[in-house]
């Protein structure tokens, strides 16, 4: 018989279960899913956490002390064989597009398979389904991911802000990469592949002049083709971000990365109903969110209505003394 979240099926951890969490879409999606791991381990610290992710997002999880294994999702792979090798007792598929995950988990004999109720094959293969809708609820996406833990009674409440980790050598290299830039350093991402809105080049030129006049040293970290810094991989970019005193970025993967690295962040967001701060703002105490004035506009135009001077009080607030581990 099919079990659904609304049926309030109660499962329990016996201790030492191997849990595989699948999140095979964008960087930001993976980052807002980390509270699922944190919630499990806060109640059951002996659980063993594995992740199934894409190769482009896997570097985010390096050095994370709570992760036992990171496994790559590739095209055409034998997922059933992978699951038999890992031998998890639980598979949680947080993304709704990669429906092969749950069907392969069933073929591999995984006892508990939790997924969103999307796609007939996935619905039939899951043991527990999440039917709750994501849109128009006013809930943050991180809260939506915690819904997948309802069979264990671990859903609800505020999600723990995601955290990313760097090695001492990586932090040192990040400081070396930016040694030529006098502090306070203001790292800038002009746009992101997943950004809901971003200003034009002319807007950024005016904004950087204003930031410089206020004593900041702006440096463009991304996109790579517009940065004057040598090319770097994702871990190197994370280290450079950590070496900055603050980051300004449209809402995209880098914004969530900055918050998870505990770098003070000003996040620029648009007005689309499905991309509001309530749903997608990066999580963390050092995050300031700025939206452009209404009405809604195309992704690259509406943000130009925002006066760059509006950002200055946010940057001043982020300059207030705060503790940043490892810096």
For each of these PLM feature ranges, what is it?
Residues 1-327:
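Catalytic machinery of carbohydrate-active enzymes
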């Amino acid at each position: 018989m099919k079990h659904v979240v609304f049926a309030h099926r109660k499962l329990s951890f016996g201790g030492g279960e191997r849990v595989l969490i699948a999140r095979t879409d964008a960087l930001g999606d993976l980052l807002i899913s980390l509270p699922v791991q944190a919630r499990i381990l806060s109640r059951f610290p002996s659980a063993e956490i594995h992740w199934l992710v894409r190769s482009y997002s896997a570097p985010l999880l390096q050095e994370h002390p709570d992760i036992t294994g990171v496994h790559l999702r590739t095209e055409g792979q034998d997922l059933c064989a992978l699951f038999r090798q890992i031998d998890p007792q639980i598979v949680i598929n947080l993304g709704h597009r990669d429906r092969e995950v749950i069907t392969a988990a069933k073929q591999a004999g995984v006892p508990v398979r939790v997924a969103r109720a999307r796609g007939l094959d996935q619905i039939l293969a899951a043991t527990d389904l999440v039917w709750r809708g994501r849109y128009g609820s006013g809930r943050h996406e991180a809260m939506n991911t915690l819904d997948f833990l309802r069979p264990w009674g671990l859903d609800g409440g505020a999600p723990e802000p995601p955290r990313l980790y760097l090695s001492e050598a990586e932090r040192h290299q990040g400081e070396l990469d930016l040694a030529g830039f006098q502090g306070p350093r203001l790292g800038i991402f002009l746009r992101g592949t997943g950004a809901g809105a971003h200003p034009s080049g002319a807007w950024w030129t005016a904004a950087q002049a204003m930031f410089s006049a206020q004593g900041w040293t702006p440096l463009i970290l991304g996109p790579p083709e517009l940065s004057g810094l040598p090319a770097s991989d994702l871990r190197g970019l994370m280290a450079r971000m950590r070496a900055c005193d603050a980051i300004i970025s449209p809402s995209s993967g880098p914004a969530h990365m900055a918050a998870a690295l505990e770098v003070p962040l000003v996040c620029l967001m648009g007005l689309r109903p499905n991309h509001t701060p309530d749903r997608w703002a990066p999580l963390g105490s050092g995050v300031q969110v700025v939206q452009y004035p209404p009405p809604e506009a195309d992704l690259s135009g509406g943000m130009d209505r925002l006066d760059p001077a509006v950002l200055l009080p946010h940057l001043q607030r982020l300059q207030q003394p705060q503790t940043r581990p490892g810096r």
